Amino acid sequence: MFMSTDEVRRAFLSFFESKGHQIVESSSLVPANDPTLLFTNAGMNQFKDCFLGLEKRAYTRATTAQRCVRAGGKHNDLENVGFTARHHTFFEMLGNFSFGDYFKEDAIQYAWEFLTDVLQLPKERLLVTVYETDDEAFDIWNKKVGIPADRIIRIGDKKGGKKFDSDNFWQMGDTGPCGPCTEIFYDHGDHIWGGPPGSPEEDGDRFIEIWNNVFMQFNRHADGTMEPLPKPSVDTGMGIERISAIMQGVHSNYEIDVFQTLIKAAADAIGYQDLTNQSLRVVADHIRSCAFLIVDGVMPSNEGRGYVLRRIIRRAVRHGNKLGAQGAFFHKLVGPLAEVMGTAGVELKKQQALVEKVLRIEEENFGRTLDRGMSILNDALDQLSGQVLDGETVFKLYDTYGFPADLTNDVARERGFSIDEAGFEQAMEEQRQRAREAGQFGTDYNSLIKSATNTEFCGYTASRGQSVVREMFVEGAEVSTLSAGDKAIIVLDNTPFYAESGGQCGDTGVLKTDAGIFHVEDTQKLGNAIAHHGVLAQGVLATGDQVDAIVDEKRRAAISLNHSATHLLHAALRKVLGEHVAQKGSLVRAETLRFDFSHLEAMTAAEIKEVERLVNQEVRRNHSIETNIMNIDEAKAKGAMALFGEKYDDQVRVLSMGDFSTELCGGIHASNTGDIGLFKIISEGGIAAGIRRIEAVTGEGALDYLDAQQAQHDAKVSEMAAKAKLLEKEIQQLKDKLAAKESAGLINQVKQIAGVNVLVAQLNGADNKALRGMVDDLKNQLSSGIIMLGNVAEGKVGLIAGVTNDLTNKVKAGELVNMVALQVGGKGGGRPDMAQAGGTDAHALPSALESVDAWIAERL
C-alpha cells in the first residue's frame, strides 16, 4: 500500500487521537526554556518538564509530528548528510507519549496495531529488540502480540561500557528518569547487505529501526541505585522519512516523495540533470532545515543558532556552485518545499516571502566571496605535500571568505584530504564563540533547583495576598532559613506575582513578615512553581512562614498598559502592512515596549503614522479588555491569533479588545484600552533580515517622551535663533565693511555744482541699513556736500539722500529723495540732513538719478 509522507503523518496522528491522545502541534525548533539544547532534536523535548514532574497538563496522552534539527553540538549529522541514505539535518519525529497514564503493554499494542493494521506492513518483515533484562516487554511481544521468540532480540550493555550503557536503555543524564526501550526494525530483504541488531553485521542497511518505545520507569540516583517511578511514562519516536520510504517501496530516504520533489526542484534551479548526484541530496536536505529554522525565528548570524543556520546555507550554496549554479538558486526551493510538506507546511506558506528573502540575501552575500575562497582552497590543496590542510589556512578561509570549517572539510574530503581541526581551533582563539555551541547554551542552572511545589497564581485579580513559604534556594541549594543580605529564590504556595512569560517581564515587590522583609527583584517560572528572586533586606525568613506578598502596583500598572498596547500594535501592523506580519518576539517593561515582527523592508513614515493613528483610535474607543477561557480549537475558530511555535495548553486564555484584536495571552493587562491614554512609536528598525523592531511608549511614558521631545525642540529652536542672531550680526558687519569699501570708491565720483560737492550714484544689492551707513561715511569724508544714492535689490528700488548741515538751508534731503522717488513709482521723505524712500520701477532709476544735478543746481 503506497502512502505519501503527508498521508503517513495524518494517519499516525489520527490513529493516536482515536486512542485518546491529544494532538499537540510541533513545538518550535528553538527549544523553549531549555538553555542546554541548541535545537529541538526529539519529540519529547517539549514534554521534558512533564516527564520530570515539573509541569502538569490538561492531558496525560499526547501525539505529535515534531520538526527536529540535528546540526551542531552533540547531535551533529551535518558532515554525513547527502552521503548516506538516512542522515538529515532536518527530520520529522512522529511520537506518542504517556505521562503516568498507560505503560508498556498499551504502548507496544498501539505500535503493532498501527504498523500492521493501519499501514498494513507484513508482520514477517518486522522484528523487535528489548533490553536484556526487560522480561516484561519480552513477554508482551511474545505472549500478547504473538511475535515468535526468535524474532525478539535481547540487547545488553555495550562491551567495556558502564552498566545500562545500551542502545536499548534510555537515560536523560547521569541521574534522573531512565528506563529500558524496545525498538521495532523493518527487514528490507536479503538483497541488501546487513544483519539484525546485535549481530556483527548490524551496521548494514537491511534491518532499519523504524520505531523506538522508551519506558521511563526508574529514577537513577547519584550512587547508581534505581528507584521505581511512582508514575512511569512512555516516550516513543518514529522518523517519518524512514517509515515513508517503506510505504513508498524505496530503500533510501532520499527516494521518498518529499525529497524527490526537492531534488528535482534543485536540479531545475541549478540547471543540472543527473538526479542521483549527492550534491542535490545535500541541497534538498538543507532547504528543509534552513526554511523551518527561519520560520521559527532563527536568522543567519555569526553566533549560536544563527551561525549553525549560516553554515547549513553556505554548505548548500557550495554544493550548488559545485554543480554549476549561476546566481542565487537556493531560495527558489522554498515554494516547492511548502507545497510538498502538506499539512506540516502551513506556516511556511504564510512566511514564504520572508524565508525566500532571507535565503536570497545570505546566498548573494556568500556568493561574492565563494569563488575567490574556492580558488584559494583548491590552490592550497594542490600545493599540499601531506594529507592534512593546516589550521591557519582553514581559519583564513573562515575569517576572510566566510567558509565554515566543516565546509572546508567537505571540500578537502572530496579530494582525499582532511583538515587540522586542532590548528584551526588554536587560530580561532577569542573568535571561537562563533562555533557550534555558543556560550549561551551552557549549564541549565535552573535544573539544579527541583521544586516540588505547584504555585497557584492569583495575580489576575489581586496585587497582594497571604502566602506560605514552601521552599527557599541559595546558589542552587535548598535552605530552610534566610538571614539579612542573603540572595535567594523563594517559592510560595500561591502568589500574586506574575512570572516572566510571553515577553512580559516578571513582577517586583516585597514579601513581608513581622520578622523580615524580602525584596523581590524578579519573578520567573520554575516548572509548575513560581520563583521569587531577590534579597532578604532585613530580619530572618524561614520555610513555613506566612508572608504578605505585595506586588509593586505602580510598576505593574505601567507594564499592563504596555502589554495591552502591544496587542493593539500587532493588530494595527497586520492591517497596515499585511497579514504576513507575525510576532517574532517582544519585551514588555514598565518603561517601554518592544515588538519584533516579520516584514521585508523598513516602514515608511506614512506607515508608522498610520499604525500610531490606528492604535490611538482604539485607545480612544475605550474598549473593555475581556478575557475568556476556552478550548484552543474554539479560540482559533474565533480568529484568536496564536504565536507560532508557542506552547499552549488545551484550555487557553483569550484576550479581546473590541473587534480590533483577539489573541491568546496569559499576561497582565489593563481593564480598558482607554487606560493606555496615549501610544507613541519612538523607533523602528531592522534587527535581522526580514525582522523589524518597534519600540514604543504609552501613558505617562508617552507624555514624558513628548515633553522631552518638546523640550529638545524648544532648545533647538532657541539654539537656532541664537545662531541666526549671531549670523545676522556677522552679516551686517560684513555688509558694513563692504559699504565702507564701496564708499571709498564712490568718493572719486564727486563732482562740483556751483562750488558744492555733489555725489549721485546707483548701487545694486545693498540694503537700506548699509546705504545709510555709506551716506554717513561719505558725509564725514566730504565735510560739506550733497549725496543721493539709489539701490536696486530683489527688483525693488531703495533711495537715500544726505546733506551736510551747512547746506540744509538750501537743499533739504527730504525734498531731494521725494523728487527722485516720484519718478520710480514711490515716495518718501525725512529730515533735512538725511532722508530715504522706496520705489517699484527699477528701470526708471537711472534717468531719475540723472535729473538730480539739475534739481540741485536750481537751488544753489
Swiss-Prot record:
Entry's free-text remark on domains: Consists of three domains; the N-terminal catalytic domain, the editing domain and the C-terminal C-Ala domain. The editing domain removes incorrectly charged amino acids, while the C-Ala domain, along with tRNA(Ala), serves as a bridge to cooperatively bring together the editing and aminoacylation centers thus stimulating deacylation of misacylated tRNAs.
Cofactor: Zn(2+)
GO molecular function: alanine-tRNA ligase activity; aminoacyl-tRNA deacylase activity; ATP binding; tRNA binding; zinc ion binding
A single cellular component GO annotation: cytosol
Primary role: Catalyzes the attachment of alanine to tRNA(Ala) in a two-step reaction: alanine is first activated by ATP to form Ala-AMP and then transferred to the acceptor end of tRNA(Ala). Also edits incorrectly charged Ser-tRNA(Ala) and Gly-tRNA(Ala) via its editing domain.
NCBIfam families (UniProt xref): alaS
Statement: the UniProt record of this protein carries the keyword Aminoacyl-tRNA synthetase: yes
PROSITE patterns: AA_TRNA_LIGASE_II_ALA
Subcellular localization(s) per the UniProt record: Cytoplasm
Organism: Vibrio cholerae serotype O1 (strain ATCC 39541 / Classical Ogawa 395 / O395)
SMART domains: tRNA_SAD
Protein name (Swiss-Prot/TrEMBL): Alanine--tRNA ligase
Keywords: Aminoacyl-tRNA synthetase, ATP-binding, Cytoplasm, Ligase, Metal-binding, Nucleotide-binding, Protein biosynthesis, RNA-binding, tRNA-binding, Zinc
UniProt cofactor note: Binds 1 zinc ion per subunit.
UniProt superkingdom: Bacteria
EC number: 6.1.1.7
Species lineage: Bacteria, Pseudomonadati, Pseudomonadota, Gammaproteobacteria, Vibrionales
GO BP terms in the entry: alanyl-tRNA aminoacylation; negative regulation of DNA-templated transcription
Binding-site list for Zn(2+): 563, 567, 665, 669
Catalytic activity as recorded in UniProt: tRNA(Ala) + L-alanine + ATP = L-alanyl-tRNA(Ala) + AMP + diphosphate
PANTHER family associated with the record: ALANINE--TRNA LIGASE, CYTOPLASMIC, ALANYL-TRNA SYNTHETASE
Protein family membership: Belongs to the class-II aminoacyl-tRNA synthetase family.
